[in-house]
């Protein structure tokens, strides 16, 4: 089947949605950027700039709208809303879609209430659409400014994944296509939780050695869970797995790292900045347990977030686990 994507819609006009609209515009596509809030849409359309990305002008080929039906007419649609709001956004969009329209989830997480991955949510909320997932090491500000970035885009059909990559790729944004949808989703969800752990380590001033150990052992957990779901090794060690983990464990530009940093310092969580890992942690632990997978770092994060254990007690418990061979 031939896929041609000249028009791209982005549903969600936050920083990441606007950055991805810029990506599609640089790739030569005609872009519709949908904002649910009318005032926000007017501000962006009038200033030709998103206040969440100051100093970065919108390309002329980006049209800002509050008309969801207009967005639904695009050849492919990027859904750029938080993971816990994905179902609602897709349900509103579903009746307006042509059969087979690709819906690309651009959130990293697991639906808290159902334990469903992002493409599973899309499949349930819009059965006539074709789900896909975009993930990888990418901060909105870097992407919006046109700094070199590489990500993974996965869909069940390789031809579709390849066509979407061709539609979005440019000299500054390099997507790799894959059919390992679940592997990509697991990498994105797990790294959010591990980034909170990395932030806690940094907030506690436990040192670079501890951060390196945490990141490495956390990655081992990500790999174990991925293998239990049949993920490919090249996905887990690729951009959407190891690559994204490295980025989000590296500094406070990551919302999940920033949340962990605040926890480690004994400060309130950052206001107005959603850290998906807060929702994902308990779900990830339950999914791991259902597959017989040990994830002690993720368990520690979930316990800290729920208030059932202190940070110091969680760290001590991790360090006092039985000694064993590295795997």
Swiss-Prot record:
Catalyzes the reduction of the glycolytic intermediate dihydroxyacetone phosphate (DHAP) to sn-glycerol 3-phosphate (G3P), the key precursor for phospholipid synthesis. Its main location: cytoplasm. It is an enzyme of class 1 (oxidoreductase). This is Glycerol-3-phosphate dehydrogenase [NAD(P)+]. Sn-glycerol 3-phosphate binds at residues 108, 136, 138, 191, 244, 254-256. Keywords: Cytoplasm, Lipid biosynthesis, Lipid metabolism, NAD, NADP, Nucleotide-binding, Oxidoreductase, Phospholipid biosynthesis, Phospholipid metabolism. Belongs to the NAD-dependent glycerol-3-phosphate dehydrogenase family. InterPro entries: 6-PGluconate_DH-like_C_sf, 6PGD_dom2, G3P_DH_NAD-dep, G3P_DH_NAD-dep_C, G3P_DH_NAD-dep_N, NAD(P)-bd_dom_sf. GO terms for cellular component: cytosol. NCBIfam families: PRK00094.1-2 (NF000940), PRK00094.1-4 (NF000942). Transmembrane segments: none annotated. Pfam families: NAD_Gly3P_dh_C, NAD_Gly3P_dh_N. The active site is at residue 191. GO terms for molecular function: glycerol-3-phosphate dehydrogenase [NAD(P)+] activity; NAD binding. PROSITE patterns: NAD_G3PDH (PS00957). Pathway: Membrane lipid metabolism; glycerophospholipid metabolism. It catalyses: sn-glycerol 3-phosphate + NAD(+) = dihydroxyacetone phosphate + NADH + H(+); sn-glycerol 3-phosphate + NADP(+) = dihydroxyacetone phosphate + NADPH + H(+). NADPH binds at residues 16, 36, 108, 140, 255, 274, 276. PANTHER family: GLYCEROL-3-PHOSPHATE DEHYDROGENASE (PTHR11728), GLYCEROL-3-PHOSPHATE DEHYDROGENASE [NAD(+)] 2, CHLOROPLASTIC (PTHR11728:SF1). Its EC number is 1.1.1.94. It comes from the Bacteria. One of its GO terms (biological process) is phospholipid biosynthetic process. It is found in: Cytoplasm.
């Amino acid at each position: 089947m031939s896929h041609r994507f000249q028009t791209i819609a982005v549903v969600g006009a936050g920083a990441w949605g606007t950055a991805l609209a810029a990506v599609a515009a640089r790739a030569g596509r005609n872009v519709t950027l949908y904002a649910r809030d009318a005032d926000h849409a007017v501000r962006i359309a009038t200033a030709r700039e998103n206040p969440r990305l100051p100093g970065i002008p919108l390309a002329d080929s980006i049209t800002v709208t509050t008309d969801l039906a207009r967005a639904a007419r695009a050849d492919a649609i990027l859904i750029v809303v938080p993971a816990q709001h994905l179902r609602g956004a897709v349900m509103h969009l579903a009746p307006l879609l042509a059969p087979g329209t690709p819906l690309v989830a651009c959130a990293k997480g697991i639906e808290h209430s159902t334990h469903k991955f992002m493409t599973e949510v899309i499949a349930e909320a819009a059965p006539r659409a074709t789900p896909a997932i975009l993930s990888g090491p990418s901060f909105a500000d870097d992407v919006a400014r046109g700094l070199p970035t590489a990500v993974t885009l996965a869909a069940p059909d390789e031809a579709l994944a390849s066509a979407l990559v061709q539609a979005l790729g440019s000299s500054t944004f390099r997507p790799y296509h894959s059919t390992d949808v679940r592997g990509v989703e697991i990498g994105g969800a797990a790294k959010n939780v591990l980034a909170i752990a990395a932030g806690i380590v940094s907030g506690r001033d436990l040192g670079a050695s501890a951060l390196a150990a945490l990141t490495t052992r956390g990655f081992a957990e990500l790999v174990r869970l991925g293998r239990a779901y049949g993920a490919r090794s090249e996905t887990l060690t690729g951009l959407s797995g190891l690559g994204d983990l490295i980025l989000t464990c590296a500094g406070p530009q990551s919302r999940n790292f920033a949340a962990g940093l605040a926890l480690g310092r004994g400060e309130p969580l950052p206001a107005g900045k959603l850290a998906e890992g807060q929702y994902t942690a308990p779900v990830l632990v339950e999914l791991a347990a259902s597959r017989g997978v040990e994830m002690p770092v993720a368990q520690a994060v979930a316990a800290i977030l729920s208030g059932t254990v202190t940070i110091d007690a969680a760290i001590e418990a991790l360090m006092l686990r039985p000694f064993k061979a590295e795997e």
